[in-house]
């Protein structure tokens, strides 16, 4: 049977609805008062003309170009909350040569960092997390052992705007990670993580959709998907399913030694067990999260509150210094193993040729 012929129309980039359209002045500053304020001549105001299909093409062309570009990434970050974006900011500043994809299930990035505790506006960060704010150029009130940002949304919007300006970083929001790509090392017979399985947020496994997903290969995955709740700690929960060891919530996962700075080989996936997050203790929690941020299994770094579910450490409540500095530590951990994991991936299926 002869396949149907595909018909294509030549794209129309733009057309002229108003050939007499001229440049219009909008001045956002005025010293006038008492009814004399005017930022523009609104009687003569008119937007430049555009065809609806031009808008569609402007969006879709760029989005699918990004899908193609980041299908093979150096690093994938799961979750665009405070820890994930802090890591992205640190990675973007230090390695502009790397392709970094951020996957966020929500339409609006930021996680739980748009407010402080109990819907209050101010954000508290214990020192020395103020140094991260200094690097971003963010103002705060210094209260001695801690600092206060006047609104949590100021922190998050500033951080987000800086991350999104990096040309080597792409945020895919409204996109869910529903599984992990694994590789088995023929030399050691151990599995490692080599990418993520993604889908539109409304079509992932939790919706019981039969829609097959898409994939992104990378050398290191950084997971910062948060704690508890139906979408929290996704990667840690999936690792436990991939592991062969029986679940023992009293034992938790093997914690790293914090008395040495020597890079340690992570545990195999087959040994992975969730520790289960403990109750709130601000003083214990923040130190534990930052110090414990690491590559937990080959190819996967876990940071932020997801790590509390892995290690069985305490939650910290409405103090956010550990989220920022766990992101910094995560960026360090990623960069320290990136070349090794890249070499292992290339030995498995060959180097990417794009």
From Swiss-Prot:
Listed InterPro entries: FAD/NAD-bd_sf, Sti35, Thi4_fam
Subcellular location per the Swiss-Prot or TrEMBL entry: Cytoplasm; Nucleus
One of the GO BP terms on file: thiazole biosynthetic process
Cofactor(s) for this UniProt protein: Fe cation
Catalytic activity: [ADP-thiazole synthase]-L-cysteine + glycine + NAD(+) = [ADP-thiazole synthase]-dehydroalanine + ADP-5-ethyl-4-methylthiazole-2-carboxylate + nicotinamide + 3 H2O + 2 H(+)
The entry's keywords: Cytoplasm, Iron, Metal-binding, NAD, Nucleus, Thiamine biosynthesis, Transferase
Binding residue positions for substrate: 83, 104-105, 112, 177, 212, 227, 305, 315-317
GO molecular function list: cysteine-dependent adenosine diphosphate thiazole synthase activity; iron ion binding
Enzyme Commission no: 2.4.2.60
Cofactor note: Binds 1 Fe cation per subunit.
Enzyme class: transferase
GO cellular component entries: cytosol; fungal biofilm matrix; nucleus
Signal peptide (UniProt feature, chain positions): none
Functional note: Involved in biosynthesis of the thiamine precursor thiazole. Catalyzes the conversion of NAD and glycine to adenosine diphosphate 5-(2-hydroxyethyl)-4-methylthiazole-2-carboxylic acid (ADT), an adenylated thiazole intermediate. The reaction includes an iron-dependent sulfide transfer from a conserved cysteine residue of the protein to a thiazole intermediate. The enzyme can only undergo a single turnover, which suggests it is a suicide enzyme. May have additional roles in adaptation to various stress conditions and in DNA damage tolerance.
Similarity comment: Belongs to the THI4 family.
NCBIfam families: sulfide-dependent adenosine diphosphate thiazole synthase (TIGR00292)
Oligomeric form and interacting partners: Homooctamer.
Protein name (Swiss-Prot/TrEMBL): Thiamine thiazole synthase
Lineage, uppermost ranks: Eukaryota, Fungi, Dikarya, Ascomycota, Saccharomycotina
Gene, per the UniProt record: THI4
